[in-house]
């Protein structure tokens, strides 16, 4: 009997409800795995229908078409002589489960339902599925007739079960189960399971790869064994980008690493590993062995098939390797770029339209598109036929082969500087120079005529003409005049996106890109239905701090020196009149806080789950060397006042690439009301009382502080009760 096994895992760019495309990608991955000598192939979570079907899981069609794809896979000669592990939704006794279906040679060996469902952040699995809660128990699943006719089986095992081959034992985890405190791999490993598989639907978040790799290596470090992780990759229909990172680990070390960001629709990893290395590693850990004697056994499905071959002495084994991580700046350069590529080719539009202001945010969006063009050119040069076909379809030229990212950018990206009488020459120059360097088709236009026309209608109807504060107007007039400019830019962006190519004699329309960052969205520092309103936003989930680091990275990586000028310029909306030809409006002055402070507020609010009072308490210590308690209180109250006042803007926010755990995305990730009492009277009074106590304590002698300590504090609610008449 052999001792070396060759196993395969993969990352597939599946698309929700694209059953034909998903089927072909699954089939191709199996074919590649067999070609590399693998005897077991693992695919991503729910790969047959695509992970992001959301409420389509409620539809019987989704279940039906998934079964049809499974039948097609079972019937294909490609799937013969290799154990195939695929993911799909299954209805069992009128309950819907997220399942793995494991089959070999037209026979379904077992169905393993997911036991721990992801239901936080962007995940809502409990809305569509039920977890299997019967540990180490199985039932008989009655196959639909279309499968009975094909497999000649009436029922198959369904439940928490492992697979015993002639030479080893394989157990399944599904995505979230790896992240739970009591992961199934622990008991499975103690019960003699030597190979653990994990089919994931895990999306990208900046700096998340470290956690994923640590979980896998730790799982095999404490308990020994081989661990395969498969994941989806790409944009499968919404704000999330699934970032691959397929991997194979053994005994705490990585033996195969997949790409995190790639335009390849199918990526297959294989490793040849020695089962005796697993057995000797496990047997040496005496504390593990003692626990193994107490573990309850798993039901086993046996199969007359081996993952090893009998004559394998000369078969080379894979070597351990160090995982290569991307810097956050690289992640921003690659993740959103791949997401944009998927969105563009699958939407069948002809390119992007980007309002380019000359500031950091729109420059970052432009750089992401340029990075996308670089990835496309590299993929074509490496022989990726699918990318070549896609780009030929986009430019409507069957003989076209992209060679230069700048030339491709000129075909796919139209940028536009929309000047007003409040715009400076500096921002105009920076926008024009950046467009020249990346090669985009660039337009310069003035919005003043449109602004005057809109204000003329208002003046005609009311007999009044609003003025800026600099010209003696009120704050209401000042804000209205700023918003008119911003909203006209949005209208013009959509007009030019729809007709720009038509005016040039080319086919198709363009997707409008937004450039509002996550910090400005959190505070509401944007005009509702301005240029933040777009089709998609590649930077909407990224903080200003990370964006500045990313733009600095692009300046060096892509040799774009104008980005240094953009970084050194003050952030400004340029919606108010210039003062002696110079910009007088600064973003951080308008907001009343710095972008760095705003990032801290965002993380405390969402990640640390801090309301106004808790945030104040945390910041007292964090900012003790920079601000007094009174100043901290003022900043916290200002943030929550503005945040709650502007929360309604999140309900119409442009769909943005999800990249941060403190995103205020109202769609699914950050569910909050949008009508608040913006005075926060109870919460702010708690803060004010704490400030008074701190100030009083600072002015007291030591004896007075001791006496104060033993006084009964006045309850907060007594201060809020109505006073007696």
From Swiss-Prot:
UniProt EC number: 6.3.5.1
Record-level GO cellular component terms: cytosol
Keyword Metal-binding listed: no
Keyword Oxidoreductase: no
Catalytic activity: deamido-NAD(+) + L-glutamine + ATP + H2O = L-glutamate + AMP + diphosphate + NAD(+) + H(+)
Organism field: Mus musculus (Mouse)
Reported function: Catalyzes the final step of the nicotinamide adenine dinucleotide (NAD) de novo synthesis pathway, the ATP-dependent amidation of deamido-NAD using L-glutamine as a nitrogen source.
Official protein name in the record: Glutamine-dependent NAD(+) synthetase
Alphabetical keyword list: ATP-binding, Ligase, NAD, Nucleotide-binding
Domain CN hydrolase: 5-275
Free-text tissue specificity from the UniProt record: Highly expressed in small intestine, kidney, liver and testis. Weakly expressed in skeletal muscle, spleen, lung, heart and brain.
A GO biological process held by the record: NAD biosynthetic process
Active site (record annotation): 45, 114, 175, 357
Domain of life: Eukaryota
Assembly with partners or alone: Homohexamer.
Pathway(s) this gene product operates in, as recorded in its UniProt entry: Cofactor biosynthesis; NAD(+) biosynthesis; NAD(+) from deamido-NAD(+) (L-Gln route): step 1/1
Family, per entry: In the C-terminal section; belongs to the NAD synthetase family.
Gene Ontology MF terms in the entry: ATP binding; glutaminase activity; NAD+ synthase (glutamine-hydrolyzing) activity; NAD+ synthase activity
Gene assigned in the entry: Nadsyn1
């Amino acid at each position: 009997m052999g001792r070396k096994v060759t196993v395969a895992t993969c990352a597939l760019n599946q698309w929700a409800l694209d059953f034909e495309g998903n089927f072909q990608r699954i089939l191709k991955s199996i074919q590649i795995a067999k070609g590399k000598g693998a005897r077991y192939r693992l695919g991503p979570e729910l790969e047959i229908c695509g992970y992001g079907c959301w409420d389509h899981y409620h539809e019987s069609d989704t279940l039906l078409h998934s079964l049809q794809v499974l039948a097609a896979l079972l019937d294909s000669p490609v799937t013969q002589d290799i154990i195939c592990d695929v993911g799909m939704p299954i209805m069992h006794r009128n309950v819907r489960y997220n399942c793995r279906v494991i089959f070999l040679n037209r026979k379904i060996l077992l169905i393993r339902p997911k036991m721990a469902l992801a239901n936080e952040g962007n995940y809502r699995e409990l809305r569509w599925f039920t977890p299997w809660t019967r540990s180490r128990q199985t039932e008989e699943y009655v196959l639909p007739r279309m499968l009975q006719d094909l497999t000649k089986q009436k029922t198959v095992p369904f439940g928490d079960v492992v697979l015993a081959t002639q030479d080893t034992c394989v157990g399944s985890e599904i995505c979230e189960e790896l992240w739970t405190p009591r992961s199934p791999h622990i008991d499975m490993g103690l019960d003699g399971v030597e190979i653990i598989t994990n089919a994931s639907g895990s999306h990208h978040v900046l700096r998340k790869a470290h956690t994923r790799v640590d979980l896998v290596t730790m799982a095999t470090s404490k308990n020994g064994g081989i661990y395969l992780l498969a994941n989806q990759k790409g944009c499968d229909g919404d704000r999330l980008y699934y970032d691959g990172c397929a991997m194979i680990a053994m005994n705490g070390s990585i033996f195969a690493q997949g790409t995190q960001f790639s335009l390849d629709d199918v990526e297959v990893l294989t490793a040849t590993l020695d089962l005796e290395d697993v057995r000797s590693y496990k047997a040496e850990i005496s504390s593990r062995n003692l626990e193994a004697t107490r573990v309850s056994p798993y039901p086993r499905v046996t199969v007359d098939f081996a993952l090893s071959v009998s004559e394998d002495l000369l078969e080379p084994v894979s070597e351990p390797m160090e995982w290569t991580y991307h810097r956050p700046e690289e992640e921003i350069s690659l993740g959103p770029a791949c997401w944009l590529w998927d969105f563009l080719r699958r939407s069948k539009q002809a390119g992007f339209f980007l309002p380019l202001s000359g500031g950091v945010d729109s420059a970052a969006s432009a750089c992401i598109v340029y990075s996308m063009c670089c990835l496309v050119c590299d993929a074509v040069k490496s022989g990726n036929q699918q990318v070549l076909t896609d780009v030929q379809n986009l430019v409507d030229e069957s003989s076209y082969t992209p060679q230069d990212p700048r030339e491709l950018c000129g075909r796919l990206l139209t940028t536009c500087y929309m000047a007003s009488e409040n715009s400076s020459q500096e921002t105009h120059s920076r926008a024009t120079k950046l467009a020249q360097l990346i090669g985009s088709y660039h337009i310069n236009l003035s919005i003043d005529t449109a602004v005057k026309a809109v204000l003329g209608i208002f003046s005609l109807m009311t007999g009044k003409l609003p003025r800026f504060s600099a010209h003696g107007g009120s704050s209401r007039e000042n804000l209205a005049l700023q918003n008119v400019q911003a909203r006209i830019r949005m209208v013009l962006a959509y007009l030019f996106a729809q007709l720009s190519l038509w005016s040039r004699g080319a086919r198709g329309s363009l997707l409008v890109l937004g450039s509002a960052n996550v910090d400005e969205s959190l505070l509401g520092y944007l005009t509702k239905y301005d240029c933040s309103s777009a089709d998609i936003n590649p930077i909407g989930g990224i903080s200003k701090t990370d964006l500045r680091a990313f733009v600095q990275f692009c300046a060096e990586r892509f040799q774009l020196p104008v980005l240094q000028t953009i970084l050194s310029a003050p952030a400004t909306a340029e919606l108010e009149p210039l003062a002696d030809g110079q910009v007088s409006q600064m973003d951080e002055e308008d907001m009343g806080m710095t972008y760095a402070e705003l990032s801290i507020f965002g993380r405390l609010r969402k990640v640390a789950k801090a309301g106004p009072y808790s945030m104040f308490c945390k910041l007292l210590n964090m900012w003790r060397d920079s601000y007094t308690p009174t100043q901290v209180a003022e900043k916290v109250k200002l943030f929550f006042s503005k945040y709650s006042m502007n929360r309604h803007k999140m309900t119409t926010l442009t769909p943005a690439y999800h990249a941060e755990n403190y995103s205020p995305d109202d769609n699914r990730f950050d569910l909050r009301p949008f009508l608040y009492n913006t005075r926060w009277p109870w919460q702010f009074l708690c803060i004010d009382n704490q400030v008074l106590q701190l100030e009083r304590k600072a002015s007291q002698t030591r004896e007075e502080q001791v006496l104060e300590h033993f006084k009964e504090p006045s309850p907060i609610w007594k201060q809020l009760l109505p006073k007696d008449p």
